Swiss-Prot record:
Principal subcellular localisation of the protein: membrane
Entry annotated with the keyword Membrane: yes
InterPro entries, A to Z: KdpC
Descriptive protein name: Potassium-transporting ATPase KdpC subunit
Function, as annotated: Part of the high-affinity ATP-driven potassium transport (or Kdp) system, which catalyzes the hydrolysis of ATP coupled with the electrogenic transport of potassium into the cytoplasm. This subunit acts as a catalytic chaperone that increases the ATP-binding affinity of the ATP-hydrolyzing subunit KdpB by the formation of a transient KdpB/KdpC/ATP ternary complex.
Length: 193
């Protein structure tokens, strides 16, 4: 009986050391040396102060800023601790109310492009409720409002949007997108500079 326990204990100790200590230590060292920024949350700093992450959206509702997707987290928007599945079904009355509320906010802000449908990502939330990016169509839809609020030329704001529009990942995966935080920070810099 004793002869059975010794190999089990040795195997347990070896696997615990490998999977609980060695593997996490190697992966942490690899992440910190090769992917330092990503391993630490892809933080964005301005003037030595962290202002956000490229990976988690932030609440912007002032007219001089581009607005991101709706956040479905609670008790406050873009709360990473409250992230969970948030997709409502197409016939759910709560989704219709959410869309109507966001449409009303967009109309109240003014400066909608004539004859252009509101992009769906401006009136619906993402699956996680934390999406930091919008489609180029959603950014283009807001250019006139942002330019008017900042007293900037529409073409200047459009050029900044173009500069911050990223294509598909590796040219294949996903869709083109614009990081809202990076775009808004670039607009602040352009207006100051």
């Amino acid at each position: 009986m004793k002869s059975l326990f010794r190999p089990m204990i040795v195997i347990f100790a070896v696997l615990a050391a490998l999977t609980g200590l060695a593997y996490p230590a190697v992966m942490t060292a690899f992440g910190q040396t090769v992917f330092h920024n990503e391993a630490n949350g892809s933080m964005i700093a301005k003037n030595g102060k962290v202002v956000g992450s490229r990976l988690i959206g932030q609440q912007f509702d002032a007219p001089q800023y581009f607005w991101g997707r709706l956040s479905a987290t609670s008790p406050m928007p873009y709360n990473a601790q409250g992230s969970s599945g948030s997709n409502l079904g197409p016939i759910n009355p709560a989704l219709a109310d959410e869309v109507k509320g966001r449409l009303a906010a967009l109309q109240a802000a003014g400066h909608q492009p004539a004859g252009v449908a509101v992009p769906v990502d401006l009136v619906t939330s993402s699956g996680s409720g934390l999406d930091p990016e919008i489609s180029p169509a959603a950014a283009a839809y807001q250019i006139e409002r942002v330019a008017a609020a900042r007293k900037m030329n529409v073409s200047d704001v459009a050029a900044i949007v173009d500069r911050y529009t990223r294509g598909r990942q590796f040219g294949v995966f996903g869709e083109a997108r614009v990081n809202v935080l990076e775009l808004n920070l670039a607009l602040d810099d352009a207006q100051r500079g």
